[in-house]
Curated annotation (Swiss-Prot), chain B:
The keyword GTP-binding appears for this protein: no
Pfam family membership, one: Trm112p
UniProt entry tagged with the keyword Repeat: no
Gene encoding the protein: Trmt112
Protein name as it appears in the record: Multifunctional methyltransferase subunit TRM112-like protein
Species in which this protein is naturally found: Drosophila melanogaster (Fruit fly)
SUPFAM superfamilies xrefs: Trm112p-like
An MF annotation (GO) of this entry: tRNA methyltransferase activator activity
Coiled-coil intervals, chain numbering: none
Main location: nucleus
Biological-process GO terms, alphabetical: maturation of LSU-rRNA; maturation of SSU-rRNA; positive regulation of rRNA processing; rRNA methylation
Length: 615, 124
């Protein structure tokens, strides 16, 4: 028995050796790889790759299970093999021993064969590195000498304003000269120059740029941000705010090389920034591509022979030189342009007024009818401060929920007589099934006796109305049905989804951004491309990207259905600026504002109908 | 639709309508949903209701033997009446029927227990 088992093992190993050799021979006919009997940091997976439907994720999971650390997976399109670059020899050994002839990641659960190789084939580097640089991107190698490097480091080491180490900044040290770059708003305050301007040690740099500078907006910068990156630190992909800075933006790399990623939509280009080189981002590269650095200890870069190799990062200091714009941006790259994305043309107000009813019909009522059930599933937990308001009424008060949706607030306080109304039949039916009192109407024409109601709530409703007049009319209608002394609570979505630098739940649910896997800008650009394919282009309004900050007040917010079609519906919203709700309430007759507050990305107001006696 | 809800509904928003209340109720199908009787609840809700519409509802629901045409004064002590009001206002559920504007005759259908009070733009 024991002998048999041993024999089987030997047979299996022999079979694996044979397979390994055969696969290597096939790969060799394809590209130059030389196997190594001794462990190397490079591993080839010989019999499975992209052409077999293998994903990088699957590979990384398998490798992680062995305890070995992978720096990069190299997969080539259309090939049935792929490569690992491992963090160290030990990691490489762990992966080899844990996966070779063991891992069943092949087609139909076939076992994978691995081999150490001396170097990655030249082919592997091509797809990643042989792309042209983004237009307007230049790298000037050896822009400063080693001597100048030390002089510059000394000069910036002495002074400058240090950023508070919060948020994404916790990973690196940041200093500012000229003006402070505010990471919260990604902007500068031109009215607040810093005492310390750019150190004069930097003056040697500008004459060297004469040949370029003829086409630039500026010839010397007035703002410098210094970032110190330890190995493993990075910066999420971003574009420098268009309206904050002129074209171009310069970045001098000191102390260590690094690889920077440039992206535009699905396009991605990796760019090596050697120590003491100057990066120039101008035109398209400055305005239409995001740039970022992945938080890694080791970069994978092209080797001298054309393959790939690894390069450990050292401590790197970058000097980013910019010049303040002090006005709107006039670039021709609207996708990431804050000026062009936030501009509310005068005509928009006129067109909203003209189309209000059609817009609300198509982009509010019809959408809610279509998404009623799915929407209702996502709306089950009452907001605590709304419940609190409902609990503040005497027992047996009559409370009307205008725009009650699925009626989640109608059963919050069973001591009240709660009645709800909404336009969306599908949502009313959900509430009705739960035994609630509901009827169908429009929030502008509420079929309820005047002065008959003790309390009124309107939660996330009037931001669906397309003009100020209509929003005001909805509040006036609430005031009409309230009895004197009766109180109303209104919630509307806030344009600003942060308070005191804290993100609302809406933003916090954007996990990819919060974990710095991507940025809002990246997501906007991606959605922009997706929607262009999916929807007709004659949307009257800009389309908002979910779980990102609002760029403008009147927007269409996508709702993706959960079914297989994944249909995108666009809901119209007017998101409120600070004080806008209070101002609106102040224009309603017969009421006074009791309280207003910000709650989870909403502006909220409580008002009371003035009793006749106090008039 | 419970008859307590009915008590609040009006067609006053229709162009030219002066009062629009009480609406003319027709019940084609109803059911009785039993609920716990709480005399205090009924008693405290009453001042918020319009008695003419309470009585009107009782007429349509054929409960006029229980509900007087004029609101009695000492209703607090009349627990039997409170119980009957509880039944009328909170237990009778209109599933199918209609509400009609007393001035224009505009009909608002009630189906699956939900009155549709939506007006067209040109009606208001
Ligand atoms: Zn711009």
């Amino acid at each position: 028995m024991h002998v048999e088992e041993t024999q089987q093992k030997v047979n299996k190993a022999k079979k694996a050796d044979k397979k390994q050799r055969r696969c290597l021979a096939i790969i060799k006919s394809d590209c130059e790889v030389s196997p190594s009997a001794e462990p190397t940091p490079y591993l080839a997976v010989l019999n499975v790759g992209l052409s077999n439907g293998l994903t990088e994720e699957c590979l990384l999971t398998e490798a992680a299970a062995t305890g070995g650390k992978v720096i990069q997976v190299v997969m080539l399109p259309g090939k049935s093999y792929c490569f690992f670059i491992c963090a160290s020899l030990e990691d490489s050994q762990l992966i080899y021993e844990g996966m070779h002839n063991i891992s069943t990641i092949g087609q139909q659960g076939a076992v994978a064969y691995l081999s150490y190789i001396r170097q990655l084939p030249a082919l592997a580097g091509k797809s990643e590195w042989n792309k042209p640089l983004p237009r307007g991107l230049h790298i000037i190698a050896d822009f400063v000498t080693e001597e100048e490097e030390s002089t510059l480091l000394r000069a910036i080491g002495e002074d400058g304003r240090t950023s508070e180490g919060t948020g994404s900044l916790k990973h690196r040290n940041v200093k500012h000269f000229g003006f402070e770059f505010l990471y919260g708003t990604n902007n500068v305050d031109p009215s607040k120059p810093l005492e310390q301007s750019i150190p004069s040690a930097c003056d040697i740099l500008w004459p060297r740029l004469n040949s370029f500078a003829s086409t630039w907006d500026w010839s010397s910068p007035d703002q410098l941000t210094v970032n110190e990156y330890e190995p493993g630190h990075g910066i999420p992909p971003h574009v420098d705010t268009h309206s904050a800075f002129l074209d171009p933006i310069l970045s001098l790399s000191l102390q260590s090389d690094v690889v920077m990623d440039f992206r535009r939509g699905d396009d991605q280009v990796q760019v090596r920034l050697p120590r003491r080189s100057l990066l120039i981002m101008s035109g398209e590269a400055r305005y239409d591509w995001t740039h970022g650095i992945r938080p890694k200890h080791i970069d994978v870069v092209p080797s001298a022979s054309g393959g790939l190799t690894t390069q450990a990062r050292g401590k790197r200091t970058s000097l980013t030189f910019r010049r303040l714009r002090k006005g709107p941006c006039d670039c021709s790259y609207p996708a990431l342009c804050d000026t062009q994305q936030t501009k509310v043309p005068q005509e928009l107000h006129a067109s909203l007024a003209a189309q209000a009813i059609t817009l609300e019909q198509q982009n509010v009522h019809e959408v809610y009818d279509k998404i009623a059930d799915h929407f209702s599933e996502t709306r089950h937990t009452p907001w605590p401060q709304v419940s609190e308001f409902l609990d503040s009424f005497e027992p047996q008060s009559v409370v009307l929920d205008i725009g009650c949706g699925n009626g989640k607030y109608l059963s919050c306080n069973p001591l009240l007589l709660s009645v709800g109304c909404d336009r969306a039949q599908g949502l009313l039916a959900v509430g009705r099934r739960k035994g609630q009192n509901v009827f169908r109407c429009d929030c502008l024409v509420v079929p309820v006796r005047s002065s008959s109601i003790d309390g009124c709530i309107s939660i996330a409703v009037i931001h669906h109305l397309a003009t100020k007049e209509r929003r005001l009319a909805a509040l006036q209608e609430m005031a009409r049905v309230l009895r004197p002394g009766g109180r109303a609570l209104v919630y509307v979505w806030a344009k600003d989804q942060r308070k005191n630098d804290k993100k609302s739940t809406y933003l916090r649910q954007n996990k990819a951004v919060n974990k710095e896997r991507t940025t809002e800008q990246q997501q906007r650009q991606k959605q922009h491309q997706e929607l262009e394919q999916q929807l007709s282009n004659n949307n009257p309004l800009p389309v908002h990207t979910n779980r990102t900050e609002f760029q403008q007040q009147d927007v269409l917010v996508p709702w993706k259905t959960k079914d297989e079609q994944k249909t995108t519906y666009l809901r119209y919203y007017h998101v409120f600026e600070e004080q806008e709700l209070e101002n609106l309430v102040s224009q309603v007759h017969e009421v006074q504002l009791i309280k207003s507050y910000y709650d989870q990305g909403n502006h909220c107001a409580i008002f009371e109908k003035i009793s006749k006696n106090s008039l | 639709m419970k008859l307590s809800t009915y008590n609040f509904l009006t067609s006053v928003a229709i162009k030219g309508v002066k009062v629009g209340f009480p609406l003319k109720l027709t019940i084609n199908k109803k059911e009785v949903v039993e609920s716990e009787f709480n005399p205090t609840f009924v008693e405290r809700i009453l001042p918020k209701l319009d008695w003419s519409a309470v009585y009107g509802a009782a007429q349509v629901a054929e409960l006029t033997e229980d509900i007087p045409a004029v609101q009695p004064e000492n209703i607090v002590e009349n627990e039997l009446l409170l119980q009957k009001l509880h039944h009328l206002l909170f237990e009778i559920d209109v599933l199918e029927g209609q509400l009609e504007c007393p001035e224009t005759g505009r009909v608002f259908p009630i189906s699956d227990g939900i009155p549709n009070m939506l007006l067209n733009e040109d009606e208001v």
